[in-house]
Amino acid sequence: SYIFQDPLSTLHPLYTVGHQLIEAIRVHQSISLESAKSRALSLLKNVQIPNAEERLNAYPHELSGGMRQRVSIAMALVNDPELIIADEPTTALDVTVQSQILNLLDSLRRERGLAILFITHDFGVVSQLCDRVAVMYAGQIVEQGPTETILKSPSHPYTSRLIACVPKIGRGQGSLETIPGLPPSLDKIPRGCAFANRCANAVEACRSTDIKMTATTNRTHVRCIAYSFEKQEIMQ
C-alpha cells in the first residue's frame, strides 16, 4: 500500500471519509455494504481517530491535517499489506502531530508485522524509525546500510554533506552548511558519479568510470570510486 505526502490532495473532496474507505474495501473484498462499513469504522479506531463513528460522515476538508493523514493510513491498511510505502507522510504536519503520526506508524508496524519503506529527507524520521537506510542521488542509490552506522559514519561524500547540512542544536550563530552546485538534470545524467561536479574529493576517474556498489568494512555498501580502488588494492 501507499501513503501519499498530502492527504488533502489525494482524498476526494466530494465524498465522505466513510464512503472512500468503504469503496476501497469493497473493490478488493466481496463483502456487504454493512460489513464494509463496520470494517471502515474499525480501521478508523485502529489509527486512533476520536469519535470514529462521526468521522465516517465527515468530508476531508472538515478534518485537520493530522486526522486526514490518519485516514490515509487507515486506507493503506484496508487489505492488510505486508509493505507500506510512505512518501514524506509527515511533511505537511506540525512537529507535535508529526511525532504522533510516526508513533502510530511504528506501533502499527509492530502490531501487524508489516514493513514500512519511508521516502524522506528528514534525518529525525530516519533515526527514529528506520532500521536501514538507502541514500539516493540523481535516481541512484549511492549508499546503504544500518541506520546508526550511516548516520554516525557516512561513507559517500553526498551522505556526509547531506548530514552536515542539518542544523545542530546548541551551536549558536554560524553559517549553515550547504552543498555547492546543483543536481544534474535527470534527462542528462553524466557518466560516472553524478555527484562528481559537487564533490570536493572528485578525481577525473569519477567522471569517466561506471561505479559499482562496494562493500565497506562497517557493513555498508557505497557507490564511490575511492572505496572501489581501496578494495582493488586490498585484493592485490
Language model features with spans:
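Short helical segment in ABC ATPase nucleotide-binding domains corresponding to the A-loop/adjacent helical element
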Residues: 4, 8, 14-27, 37, ...
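Hydrophobic anchor residue at the start of the ABC signature
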Residues: 21, 73, 97, 101
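ABC ATPase nucleotide-binding domain helical subdomain, centered on the C-loop/LSGGQ "ABC signature"
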Residues: 30, 34-49, 53-57, 152, ...
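Short catalytic/signature loops enriched in Gly
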Residues: 50-53, 144-236
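Conserved ABC ATPase signature
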Residues: 58-63, 67
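A short, proline-enriched helix->beta-strand linker immediately N-terminal to the Walker B motif
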Residues: 78-82
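P-loop NTP-binding/switch modules centered on Walker-like glycine-rich loops
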Residues: 85-89, 93-174
